[in-house]
């Protein structure tokens, strides 16, 4: 269903579709944890309609030509509509407000701790999404680890599960380190 982070295990599907389906076959948690890549090959220039595990760079190597990303999903304004299904709704978004902080490790830790302190003063329940390497540096109500920064597969695998955990923990705001995962989109 739209408006929720994508399901990564049978319990998530049951929660999202309760009363709407008769049965769930549980094959275990997803292997990767992020959306599949959708690509349009109907034009001369291949276009990624929904970014996922397979990057435009990977596709370019296989196809032997440049692969572009649908301008409708990267446009700053709302004038261009995405071509792919599933890009219209905020199905990646947790219920809480979320801020992603980018920069050097030292800067990110300092900024997130500053944000945590200011929101704590407002009485908000706060989650921080970090890595194994940095989780000990945060003092939030909830600190969740995406795994090791060196393990892109783990980070991708944990993304939607952690966003759902934040929903279940009923946090008001989430501060997250940014994650560059060039190998997996």
Predicted features, each with a name:
Residues 1-185:
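Active-site-adjacent structural elements in enzyme catalytic cores
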């Amino acid at each position: 269903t739209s408006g929720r982070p994508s399901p990564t295990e049978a319990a998530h599907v049951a929660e999202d579709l309760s009363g709407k389906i008769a049965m769930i076959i549980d094959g275990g948690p997803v292997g990767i944890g992020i959306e599949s890549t959708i690509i349009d090959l109907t034009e001369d220039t291949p276009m990624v309609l929904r970014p996922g595990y397979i990057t435009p760079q990977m596709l370019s190597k296989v196809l032997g030509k440049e692969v572009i990303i649908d301008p409708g999903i990267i446009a700053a304004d709302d004038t261009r509509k995405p071509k792919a299904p599933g890009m219209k709704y905020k199905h990646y978004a947790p219920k809480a407000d979320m801020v992603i902080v980018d920069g050097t490790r030292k800067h990110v830790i300092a900024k997130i701790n500053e944000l945590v302190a200011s929101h704590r003063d407002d009485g908000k329940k706060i989650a921080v999404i970090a890595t194994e390497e940095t989780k000990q540096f945060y003092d939030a109500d909830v600190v969740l680890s995406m795994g090791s920064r060196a393990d892109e597969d783990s980070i991708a695998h944990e993304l939607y599960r952690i966003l759902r955990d934040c929903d279940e923990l009923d946090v008001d705001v989430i501060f997250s380190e940014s994650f560059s995962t060039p190998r997996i989109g």
